[in-house]
Design a protein with these regions (language model features):
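HDAC/HDAC-like amidohydrolase catalytic core signature
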Residues: 1-354
Length: 354
């Protein structure tokens, strides 16, 4: 199993205490030392090598997003998210004690001090901002560079495993930030670009492949659903927890989305056997679709002891799903990390493939 990681992921600082660099630190250190088929991609400039293989609309959306991120004003305190200037119109608990604040009135010795928590905001590294009215996914001065590094990582992982117009190896992307909550006009849930969708489009456009995306993250892949619905050569199967007021609030299995979208709501405390049985129950539909490749959105937040504490799966589940798909369909499989906020769970899930 070839494993790839975006070298600059540890430069990415999110607004959450969950989506943090340390969740991947132990497994990255282990792979660097012990696994010869592990590659960290440092390139971040030549994103157009990848974008040229995408549809024109996808290229425009990505370039527009990168431009927006690289030209943003960073006006929130990274520690408490106090806003410098006029408050955002959206009501949010982060701003419940806030009041309009003139940035020039809170300067001490030429330093900008956060009025709420008294932290320095002079250094741009200590500031962030949010996309439109979204307050769960922040970005700062280098977010666009981290995303460019991720795009280059995807491109490299694909081309290194393609030979004679065929995908010849399985591989894994051990990367952050995740992607399955993002779509063309949505930055949400720690996600900025939808990596599994972009990979599917590369494979469809270059190899004329049919792609089956299977999302097993705890949360519904709402961004992926938006991107793939009614698209030719794509089938999307999403197993996730669904409950009132549980993020992102989409993915009700009782609601029809599109012929190529299958949502399955998993019960709380579901275990390996429940996921395997559910995936297997969709094999007839998958067989009728006859994919050339599987892409698995690998969310380790369904594993026992994750901070969400909803599902009770083991760290071997994804390897079991991998083996089941291999045995049944004998197709190449790409795994892409999504959520999962207990470092040991991510570490041991990856090690199960080595």
């Amino acid at each position: 199993m070839n494993i790839y990681s975006n070298y600059y992921q540890f430069k990415h600082i999110a607004s959450s205490d969950l989506e943090v660099p340390k969740r991947l630190l132990s497994i990255i250190k282990f792979l660097r030392k012990n696994y010869k088929n592990f590659t960290e991609i440092q390139e971040y400039k030549d994103v157009n090598y990848f974008l040229r293989f995408l549809h024109e609309n996808d290229r425009k959306e990505i370039n527009n997003l990168l431009y927006t991120l690289s030209n943003s004003q960073y006006d929130h305190c990274r520690k408490c998210y106090w806003y410098l200037g006029e408050l955002p119109p959206k009501k949010d608990t982060k701003y419940k004690n806030a009041k309009t604040f003139d940035i020039t009135s809170k300067q001490k010795n030429n330093k900008i001090i956060c009025e709420m928590c008294e932290e320095s905001m002079t250094d741009i590294n200590l500031r962030c901002t949010f996309h439109k009215d979204n307050t769960d996914t922040s970005y700062n001065w280098n977010t666009h560079l981290v995303l460019q590094n991720m795009i280059c990582t995807i491109y490299t992982s694909l081309v290194e495993n393609i030979k004679d117009n065929q995908l010849v190896n399985d591989f894994m992307l051990l990367t952050r930030p995740p992607g399955h909550h993002s779509s063309t006009d949505i930055i949400s849930g720690f996600c900025y670009m939808n990596w599994v969708y972009l990979m599917s489009q590369f494979l469809i456009n270059t190899l004329n492949y049919k792609v089956c995306i299977i999302d097993l993250d705890l949360h519904h892949g709402n961004g992926t659903e938006i991107m793939v619905k009614d698209k030719e050569n794509l089938l999307f199967l999403d197993l996730h927890y669904f409950a009132r007021n549980f993020y992102p609030g989409t993915g009700n299995e009782k609601k029809f989305v599109a012929d190529n979208v299958i949502n399955v709501n998993m019960r709380k405390n579901s275990k390996d056997k429940d996921y395997l049985k559910t995936v297997q129950s969709k094999f007839e539909t998958i067989g009728d679709f006859n994919p050339d490749v599987f892409i698995i959105s690998m969310g380790c937040d369904i594993i026992i002891n994750d901070p969400f504490d909803i599902m009770k799966c083991s760290t071997s589940l994804y390897k079991q799903v991998f083996d089941l798909l291999k045995k049944t369909f004998n197709k190449k499989i790409i795994l892409a990390l999504e959520g999962g906020y207990e470092a040991d769970n991510v570490h041991n899930t990856v090690k199960s493939f080595l």
